[in-house]
Amino acid sequence: MQILNPILPVMEDILGNLAELKASGKITNQQIDTVELQWYESERNILRKTSKSGREVAFRLLKEGQRLKHDDVVFVSESLVIAIEILPSEVIVLSPKTLPEMARACYEIGNKHSPLFLDGDEVTLPYDKPMFEWLQAAGFGPQKAERRLSQALRANSAQGHGHSHGHSHSHDHHGYHHHGDGNWHKH
């Protein structure tokens, strides 16, 4: 008798990515099951999800800087591989032409507390209509696209998301928020 939905251990490590593990021979003819995540779920340290084939998968990723990316492998056995699929989402794409333009774009977006991602030579961020319109008005030439957000830029991530100034201003996060742990999500 074969167990179709075995109880899996808690996933605490990222073993590599699909391409590397296939090239090294660690993944051959095993069934590959995937766990779909929204970009903001990939930032969470503790998470429970159901895979495409119905397996309950629990994550406890407590090592510093450990973040799930598209095609990461979290489980390998003789018969099964569990990999991560970061779902594409609506994004704003910026293609700065110079380093000063890149610095200015990142500074301005960061000042609005929006998460930033690198995708090759482009900067991407979750789509938000007011942000898109502001970037257009500021001359950054934003484009709207569907992409996977998985290479987050981090600044002072160990510090969390708090600061103070000699003044106050709105901290609009466009529907995304965290509970003091730096892990962004929407309800």
Swiss-Prot record:
Location of the protein in the cell: Cytoplasm
A single Gene Ontology CC term: cytoplasm
MF terms in GO: nickel cation binding; unfolded protein binding
Keywords: Chaperone, Cytoplasm, Nickel, Nickel insertion
Lineage summary: Bacteria, Pseudomonadati, Pseudomonadota, Gammaproteobacteria, Pasteurellales
Protein name according to UniProt: Urease accessory protein UreE
HAMAP family cross-referenced by the UniProt entry: UreE (MF_00822)
Top-level taxon: Bacteria
Encoding gene, per UniProt annotation: ureE
Stored SUPFAM superfamilies: Urease metallochaperone UreE, C-terminal domain (SSF69737), Urease metallochaperone UreE, N-terminal domain (SSF69287)
CDD domains recorded: UreE
Similarity field: Belongs to the UreE family.
One GO term (biological process): protein folding
Segments of skewed composition (Basic residues): 162-177
Region (Disordered), start-end ranges: 154-187
Main localization (coarse): cytoplasm
Pfam families assigned: UreE_C, UreE_N
InterPro entries: UreE, UreE_C_dom, UreE_N, UreE_N_sf
Organism listed in the record: Actinobacillus pleuropneumoniae
Gene3D superfamilies, A to Z: Urease metallochaperone UreE, N-terminal domain (2.60.260.20), UreE, C-terminal domain (3.30.70.790)
Start-end of Basic and acidic residues biased regions: 178-187
Cited function: Involved in urease metallocenter assembly. Binds nickel. Probably functions as a nickel donor during metallocenter assembly.
